[in-house]
């Protein structure tokens, strides 16, 4: 089944009870039990809800996985995975990671007695060199946020399996449409459903898919006990938004590729980071494991003055945290997505005051380029 057909038909999209053309919002906190001594079906929305079940079936289908789980945010999904670790365990993860993941590591994992080592994710040998006797998990994010650094999924996963380690991967930037991670040996794939999967900047959601039943059961406990269940309203909106993901992504990816090529030619731009460019350091690896360059790019401006000029004069993109909406979103990671990181750590990973991230929407590309042209020339 091809992707746009799959997005419309490969999971519950019609209400079985009524034939309604969309899954209803089961806006209920609790469910009547016909037999108090035999608990069957739904009981309490924190434990499960028909609308949320449809969302979980959706991500399971999109990832061709055995199990799916929905959470209240991408961070809730990330935390559910990282909390598989126990005191005394060791975690290896890339140094170029999402700021929320970094915060969980430093605010919780280290305090809970879990050792963490950050490595240069683009060097396969760095992952193996970091393994200790108590290492339990590799945590990957490729392309990374915000520098679009590439990790060789197959090679790193092969190392992990040799040492009987779990491998989790944040696949938010590429989506299940652009990068299939589970077939490469990844144990758990994570998405911020807030981003491209929903695609309309009106939902906060996290999603997980896995083929391992034991991991699924443990993550299900985390979902329930940590209280990170997706709200019914959010789930219903996500089910609506995901139907157009194929069409949205096709346009956004084309816009990102064109914008990256345009920005490369501008004297005000020192560097463009986009894995769809042949000049990108991880281009060959990315081409091997992904279907396209994605819809997010970052670029380094020549000076902070140019940064102020761009943000003051750009008119079409909204200026905001997050990404993946139908509208283009411009952000400054230094004081937005990665602001919680110490300045020294931000600079070490390459997040500078002149690094700008652009999530491309579905606008006409001629208008986006014209807007950037006038902003850069102002």
PLM segments and residue spans:
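PLP-dependent enzyme catalytic core of the Aspartate aminotransferase-like
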Residues: 106, 115, 129, 133, ...
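Short, well-ordered beta-strand elements within core beta-sheets of diverse protein domains
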Residues: 238-247, 294-302, 357-361
């Amino acid at each position: 089944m091809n992707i746009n057909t799959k997005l419309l038909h490969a999971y519950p999209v019609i209400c079985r009870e009524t034939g309604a053309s969309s899954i209803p919002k089961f806006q209920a906190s609790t469910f009547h039990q016909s037999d108090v001594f035999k608990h069957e079906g739904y009981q309490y929305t924190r434990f499960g809800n028909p609308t949320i079940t449809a969302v979980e079936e959706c991500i399971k289908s999109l990832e061709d996985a055995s199990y799916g789980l929905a959470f209240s945010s991408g961070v809730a999904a990330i935390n559910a995975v990282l909390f598989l670790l126990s005191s005394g365990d060791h975690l290896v993860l890339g140094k170029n990671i999402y700021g929320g993941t970094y915060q969980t590591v430093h605010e919780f994992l280290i305090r809970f007695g879990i050792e963490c080592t950050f490595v240069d994710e683009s060097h396969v040998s760095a992952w193996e060199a970091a393994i200790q006797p108590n290492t339990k998990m590799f945590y990957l994010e490729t392309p990374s946020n915000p520098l679009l650094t590439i990790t060789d999924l197959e090679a790193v996963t092969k190392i992990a399996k040799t040492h009987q380690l779990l491998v989790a991967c944040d696949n938010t930037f590429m989506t299940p449409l652009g990068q299939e991670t589970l077939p490469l040996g990844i144990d758990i794939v994570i998405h911020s459903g807030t981003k491209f999967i929903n695609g309309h900047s009106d939902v906060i959601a996290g999603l997980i898919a896995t083929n391992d039943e034991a991991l699924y059961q443990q993550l299900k406990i985390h979902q329930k006990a940590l209280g990170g269940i997706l709200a019914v309203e959010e789930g219903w909106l996500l089910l609506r938004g995901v139907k157009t993901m194929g069409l949205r992504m096709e346009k956004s990816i084309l816009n990102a590729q064109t914008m990256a090529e345009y920005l490369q030619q501008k004297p005000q731009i020192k560097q463009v980071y986009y894995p769809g460019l042949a000049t990108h350091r991880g281009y060959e690896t990315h081409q091997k494991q992904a279907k396209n360059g994605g819809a997010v790019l970052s670029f380094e401006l020549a000076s902070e003055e140019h940064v102020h000029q761009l943000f003051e004069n750009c008119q079409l993109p909204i200026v905001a945290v997050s990404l993946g909406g139908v509208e283009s979103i411009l952000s400054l990671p230094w004081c937005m997505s990665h602001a919680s990181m110490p300045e020294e750590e931000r600079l070490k990973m390459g997040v500078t005051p002149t690094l700008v991230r652009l999530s491309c929407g579905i606008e006409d590309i001629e208008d986006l380029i014209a807007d950037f042209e006038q902003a850069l020339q102002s």
